[in-house]
Every structure is written in C-alpha cells, then in structure tokens.
Amino acid sequence: LKISVTGSGDISGNNISCTDLDISIAGSGDINSSNITCNDLQVSVAGSGDMKLNNVTANFTRASVAGSGTAILSGSTQEAEYSVAGSGDLLASDFVAKKASASVAGSGDIKCHATDFLKVRTSGSGSVGYKGNPELDYPKKGLYKL
C-alpha cells in the first residue's frame, strides 16, 4: 500500500493493516495516521512536511527525513533504520525497536528507543538522543541519553 502527499495536501487515515506500507511526503503536506499494522514500513518526508504515525506495529521500519520536515512515530518495531539529512527531526522515542540504526547529516535530530542494539552515525551539528539500554556502536559526539 502506498500513501503519498506531493505539494501541500493533507491526508488522515486510521486502522491500516497490510503487508508493506510506503508513506511519503514531498513538499509541505501533512500525514496523520493511527493504528497501523504491517510487516515492512517505509516512511519518507522530503521538504517541510510533517508526518505523525501513532500506534504502529511493524517488523521492519525505515524512516527518513530530508529537509526541514518532521516525522513522529509511536508504537513498536523489531528493527529500524532512521536517517535525517538537513535540519529536520525524526522523533521516535515512543517507537520501541529491538535493533536500530540512526544517521544524521546536517543539523537535524533523531530521538529513538532501542532495547538491544543501537548504531549511531552523525556528521555536522546534528545529534541522536535515545531511550533504552541497548548495546551501543557510536561516535564520540552527537549521542545523548533521553
């Protein structure tokens, strides 16, 4: 299932259940959704748009923000890959992952929650904040405990 906003439109949807879900914003639009169940979740915000996904259950999640937009996730996933390029924010501290990787290029921020393992990479002034007590693979800068 693919849900996308291009430009300035807004989408709201609840109670989504599918195998693979691809949700994207390109531009200044907004997407709000609750109660999502899927195997593979792809989330992308490019531009200044905002995405809020509540009560998500997924096996694998890949979420990216490019530009000044914001993605907010809550719920749980087995494995997550997060990336921010630019000044955007990826807020997933209420999205519990067993294993996660987080990469920031620019001045953006990622907030995440990992229980078993967290790999962090930063370049620029961006940072990664985390909850949980995972094994860490991280550089000397840009990581802090929430």
Q: PLM ranges: what are they?
A:
Residues 1-146:
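Extended, compositionally simple hydrophobic/Ser/Thr-rich segments
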